[in-house]
């Protein structure tokens, strides 16, 4: 029901989500009534923006931070886009940058540097419609590589600098962390399904058979392969198996 992160069949997508929810409920023993939903696709984009405001009463408060974040969002975001995240990357007070926690600090001018992630409003609503058709309430949407990072990254890795690369079926999702902040995100509309398709075309196999070959014999690094490794396949129209050396 989805292709490269975009819904192409509402019914199939809803049914797939329902099966996933049922499986999760069965394995966890809990009823799922609401969820944070990860999102990806070629419709997702991001920009960097800055916002600046005067500091009320000369001491930074949460109100000042909120005002600065709102100012950062005064950018040319089209009406057909929905803001998923406004991620603060650092603050500057009166020209002093590199500040992470400005609350309580004295100054006159507060600036914030942000990373703003948006998605197609129509795509977001289509995903919401499919999820809520299963009886599960969508609490919020989160960009897929950010959700993945919460699971696989340590704080030390985020601090030193790291990139998350999540290769899915239809997309490859990237997020770069520097100094514990998100500095770059992107969604590339190419994933594992394209590799399967190339194998099917090159070896003249069905997609299910090509997927089996990819999983069984695929290697992430060329150094992991052996020049003497051989496997057998039966291409379309062939009665006898063919040996493949790689």
Predicted regions: what they are:
Residues 1-164, 181-183, 203-246:
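Nucleotide/phosphate-binding catalytic cleft detector across ATP-hydrolyzing
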Residues 160-202:
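Glycine-rich phosphate-binding loop of actin/hexokinase-like ATP-binding domains
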């Amino acid at each position: 029901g989805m292709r490269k992160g975009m819904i192409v069949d509402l019914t199939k997508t809803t049914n797939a989500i329902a099966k996933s929810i049922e499986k999760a409920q069965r394995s966890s023993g809990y009823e799922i009534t609401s969820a944070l939903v990860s999102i990806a696709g070629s419709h997702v984009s991001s920009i960097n923006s800055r916002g600046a405001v005067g500091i009320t009463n000369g001491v930074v408060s949460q109100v000042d931070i909120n005002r600065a974040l709102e100012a950062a969002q005064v950018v040319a975001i089209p009406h057909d886009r929905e803001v998923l995240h406004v991620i603060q990357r650092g603050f500057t007070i009166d020209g002093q940058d590199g500040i992470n926690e400005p609350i309580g600090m004295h100054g006159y001018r507060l600036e914030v540097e942000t990373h703003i992630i948006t998605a197609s409003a129509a795509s977001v609503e289509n995903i919401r419609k499919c999820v809520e058709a299963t009886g599960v309430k969508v609490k919020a949407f989160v960009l897929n590589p950010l959700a993945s990072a919460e699971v696989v990254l340590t704080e030390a890795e985020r601090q030193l600098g790291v990139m998350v690369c999540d290769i899915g079926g239809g997309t490859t999702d990237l997020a770069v962390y520097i100094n514990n902040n998100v500095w770059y995100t992107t969604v590339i509309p190419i994933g594992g399904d394209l590799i399967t398709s190339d194998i099917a075309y090159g070896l003249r196999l069905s997609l299910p058979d090509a997927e089996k070959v990819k999983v069984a014999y695929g290697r992430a690094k060329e150094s992991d392969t052996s020049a003497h490794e051989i496997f057998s396949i039966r291409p379309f129209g062939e009665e006898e198996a063919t040996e493949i050396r790689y």
